[in-house]
Amino acid sequence: MTDKIRTLQGRVVSDKMEKSIVVAIERKVKHPLYGKFIKRTTKLHVHDENNECGIGDVVEIRETRPLSKTKSWTLVRVVEKAIL
């Protein structure tokens, strides 16, 4: 059995929770009729053990076992810190 662990990159949009962040993942989808590429956004709740992320940071996340009702992703690393 070769299960590949899913990893994604996105931008932090909320860090108001304790040990949790909300990450927005952007993807481009082709419109079925007109063919134009449209941006679609998915928001994921991510476990941030050390509270190291801030709003605007670009982060890498990976899928894990369910940690709560909405959290099943964990923070791997901060790719780029936000300039405030």
Curated annotation (Swiss-Prot):
Xref: InterPro entries: NA-bd_OB-fold (IPR012340), Ribosomal_uS17 (IPR000266), Ribosomal_uS17_bact/chlr (IPR019984), Ribosomal_uS17_CS (IPR019979)
Keywords: Ribonucleoprotein, Ribosomal protein, RNA-binding, rRNA-binding
PROSITE patterns from the UniProt entry: RIBOSOMAL_S17
Cellular compartments per GO CC: cytosolic small ribosomal subunit
Pfam hit, one: Ribosomal_S17
Transmembrane spans: none
GO biological process assignments: translation
GO molecular function: rRNA binding; structural constituent of ribosome
Known partners and oligomeric status: Part of the 30S ribosomal subunit.
Family: Belongs to the universal ribosomal protein uS17 family.
Function, in words: One of the primary rRNA binding proteins, it binds specifically to the 5'-end of 16S ribosomal RNA.
Name of this protein: Small ribosomal subunit protein uS17
Species, as recorded: Photorhabdus laumondii subsp. laumondii (strain DSM 15139 / CIP 105565 / TT01)
